């Protein structure tokens, strides 16, 4: 998770430098974000089934290798068209990250522990987002912008080796005892057989998850791809100066990721229902996002950083509980497919926000409207999810009869 976010954020950190290098305007930069999101959405439509069929270990390994090569490819590009191709490839490769991660959580943890486990792995995204603006300025000073893409991309192959060395499903892991395996399977109600995407789409639970992802994921993409620019444009920080504020934002986001998972897991251990535990955590996080509407109006850079950091923490807490819903409501064998559909919806939302933010900045030069959108998205998402699924319940996927 950490490496995945490092790859996608290098472009955001180098945004102003690359705009000076190639003469890109805000709309052209928005097209680069749009290309990534388009490929991410398309990948999500197929990668979940790919990982469900190939298995978590091998499926994730393939995606790591693919996106690392795509990240390195940025360093060879000399035009907007070349960068569009590289961003598209990176987005397609990285679309496998969350479906594979959620499937791994479903394989290794019982339902009561999944939100906290999801929060911990989701915290890795914030580590990557925080490290990138600290590392990239030093690489840039020594080897230029191409060296930034080469160096960060090459790290992926270290992650690939570690993944293949360390990960096994619990049934195949030498250190997983019979008692631990029974604990993992303590709340499994599993059926076997083939399934279709059409069968998954018949359920309101699917659409609740998809709607939530469509509405909140674009806000995270906005933070990821435009916060360095916001700090440079609104508060006059240099490439070297943005590192510490970005670090603070994503450290706070880490606390939110783990804290959001802890809150719902705590409520479950206190005997609350899955429905009450997850939705309580979602509501608390949605409320905590609202103050970000003032981020563009404060004159102090650190006041703005704290407002964005609170919103980022709340987003991650919300996202942690949202990402747990597929494993709460669906059999483990379809979790990656459901997660893929949600990820595709989130990426489509990201495509829209890329063009909206780019045009707003080109026309107004102000972040006021994007922050207003960010502050309202989570309460809207929770309201839509509540309308679709007033009570979270497990889904049984029908299996076609066999001859």
Give the location of each predicted region.
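Extracytoplasmic gate region of multi-pass secondary transporters
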Residues: 11-12, 204-260, 314-327, 350, ...
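Helix-loop-helix hairpin linking two adjacent transmembrane segments in secondary transporters
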Residues: 121-174
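Extracytoplasmic
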Residues: 1-26, 223-228
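Conserved MFS/SLC helix-loop-helix module at the cytosolic interface between two early adjacent transmembrane helices
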Residues: 42-81
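Residue-level signature of mid-helix packing/kink "hotspots" within the transmembrane helices
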Residues: 9, 37-45, 129-130, 250-254, ...
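Helix-breaking motifs and short loop linkers at transmembrane-helix boundaries and internal kinks
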Residues: 23, 55, 76-82, 93, ...
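Cytoplasmic helix-loop-helix junction between adjacent transmembrane helices
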Residues: 86-126
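Structural signature of the two symmetry-related core transmembrane helices
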Residues: 58-72, 276-293
């Amino acid at each position: 998770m950490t490496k995945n976010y490092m790859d996608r954020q290098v472009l955001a950190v180098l945004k102003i430098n690359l705009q000076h290098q190639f003469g890109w305007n805000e709309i052209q930069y928005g097209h680069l974000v749009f290309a990534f999101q388009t490929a991410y959405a398309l990948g999500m439509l197929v990668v979940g089934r790919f990982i469900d069929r190939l298995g978590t270990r091998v499926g994730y390994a393939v995606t790591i290798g693919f996106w690392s090569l795509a990240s390195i490819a940025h360093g060879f590009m000399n035009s907007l068209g070349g960068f569009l191709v590289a961003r598209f490839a990176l987005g397609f490769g990285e679309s496998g990250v969350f479906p594979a991660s959620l499937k791994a959580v479903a394989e290794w943890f019982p339902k009561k522990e999944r939100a906290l486990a999801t929060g911990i792995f989701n915290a890795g995204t914030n580590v990557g987002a925080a490290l990138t603006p600290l590392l990239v300025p030093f690489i840039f000073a020594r080897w230029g912008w191409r060296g930034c893409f080469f160096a960060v991309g090459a790290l992926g192959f270290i992650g690939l080796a570690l993944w293949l060395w360390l990960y096994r499903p619990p049934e195949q892991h030498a250190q997983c005892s019979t008692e631990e395996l029974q604990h993992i399977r303590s709340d499994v109600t599993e059926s076997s057989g083939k399934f279709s995407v059409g069968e998954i789409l018949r359920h309101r639970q699917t659409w609740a998850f998809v709607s939530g992802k469509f509405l909140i994921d674009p806000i995270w993409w906005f933070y990821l791809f435009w916060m360095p620019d916001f700090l440079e444009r609104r508060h006059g920080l240099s490439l070297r100066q943005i590192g510490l504020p970005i670090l603070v934002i994503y450290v706070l986001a880490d606390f939110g990721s783990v804290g959001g998972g802890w809150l719902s897991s705590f409520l479950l251990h206190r005997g609350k229902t899955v429905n009450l535990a997850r939705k309580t955590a979602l509501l608390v996080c949605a409320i905590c996002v609202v103050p970000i509407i003032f981020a563009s109006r404060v004159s102090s850079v650190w006041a703005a950083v704290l407002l964005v950091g609170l919103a980022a923490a709340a987003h991650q807490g919300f996202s942690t509980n949202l990402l747990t819903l597929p494993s709460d409501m669906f059999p483990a064998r379809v979790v990656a497919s459901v997660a893929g559909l949600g990820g595709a919806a989130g990426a489509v939302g990201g495509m829209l926000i890329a063009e909206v933010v780019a045009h707003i900045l080109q026309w107004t030069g102000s972040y006021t409207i994007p922050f207003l959108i960010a502050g309202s998205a989570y309460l809207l998402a929770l309201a839509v999810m509540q309308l679709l699924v007033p009570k979270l319940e497990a889904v049984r996927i029908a299996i076609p009869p066999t001859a």
